[in-house]
Amino acid sequence: MEKAYRIKKNEDFQKIYKNGKSVANRQFIIYRQKNSENEHFRLGISVSKKIGNAVTRNRIKRAIRESFTKHKEDIIKDDFIVIARQPSKEMTTNEINKSLEHVMKIAKGFNKRIT
């Protein structure tokens, strides 16, 4: 995923936490904030140290990025922050993808219906 698609600055994270809407399931929390300035979506990922060691956290982050890259054309041009919860550490990449699709449908983060 290219740098233009990433949210890195703390002030951007804080703005989205404060003004964005949140949706959650057992594995993930997604904050979504409208951003008409961008021509594509932006993604921030947060995986706490409580979830596991660096290898585990990076595996989860890679799976989240892969899921968003897979649906790049279908995602609304907003800012998203994905926070991983404890149950996500036992999940496979495919299960993470399905769980994120579920939460994004609830958050109405897709342009069209995803099957």
Curated annotation (Swiss-Prot):
Molecular-function annotations in GO: 3'-tRNA processing endoribonuclease activity; ribonuclease P activity; tRNA binding
Entry annotated with the keyword Hydrolase: yes
One term under GO cellular component: ribonuclease P complex
Source taxon at top rank: Bacteria
Catalysed reactions, semicolon-separated: Endonucleolytic cleavage of RNA, removing 5'-extranucleotides from tRNA precursor
EC identifiers of the protein: 3.1.26.5
SUPFAM superfamilies, A to Z: Ribosomal protein S5 domain 2-like
Pfam families on file: Ribonuclease_P
GO BP of this protein: tRNA 5'-leader removal
Keywords of this entry: Endonuclease, Hydrolase, Nuclease, RNA-binding, tRNA processing
PANTHER family: RIBONUCLEASE P PROTEIN COMPONENT
UniProt record similarity statement: Belongs to the RnpA family.
Quaternary structure annotation from Swiss-Prot or TrEMBL: Consists of a catalytic RNA component (M1 or rnpB) and a protein subunit.
Known function: RNaseP catalyzes the removal of the 5'-leader sequence from pre-tRNA to produce the mature 5'-terminus. It can also cleave other RNA substrates such as 4.5S RNA. The protein component plays an auxiliary but essential role in vivo by binding to the 5'-leader sequence and broadening the substrate specificity of the ribozyme.
Protein name (Swiss-Prot/TrEMBL): Ribonuclease P protein component
